[in-house]
């Protein structure tokens, strides 16, 4: 409810309604944000997205900036994780009983191996156009943890030097 409220209040450009309708056909609102780090729980992805939006607004937003851009970046930067995880089971030894038990865990089931930030941009642009600064911010929101940056690519540095919104989302 909070995500949809923030989204509808701030994101009004053409296609935004179609994007939200599509989101509701995915597991975005119930999916985890990761398999073992932040938000590795049911609804972790939507909670993480709201938290990033709130942090951006609280720490960086100033009068005259685009509230819509902040909402798009904060709420949709991890859109790539919709329909990305599946629940599997693994055997874990119960410390109390000494018995092996099947326990659920999240695992990656990437149906569109397009990268991380770039996949979010790709999915968003199926429905609505992004401003260049928004696309750059979402593409590089992982910073030095992005596979391209870890592989020696310097584009993230140039993106952060040129687009302040990218630094704020990271």
Region roles according to the model:
Residues 18-25, 38-50:
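All-alpha helical catalytic cores of prenyl diphosphate-utilizing isoprenoid enzymes
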Residues 1-31:
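Non-catalytic interface/linker regions that flank or bridge core catalytic/transmembrane domains
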Residues 12-15, 41, 68:
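Residue-level recognition of alpha-helical structural elements
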Residues 35-39, 47, 54, 58-170:
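Divalent metal-dependent catalytic cores for phosphoryl transfer on phosphate-bearing substrates
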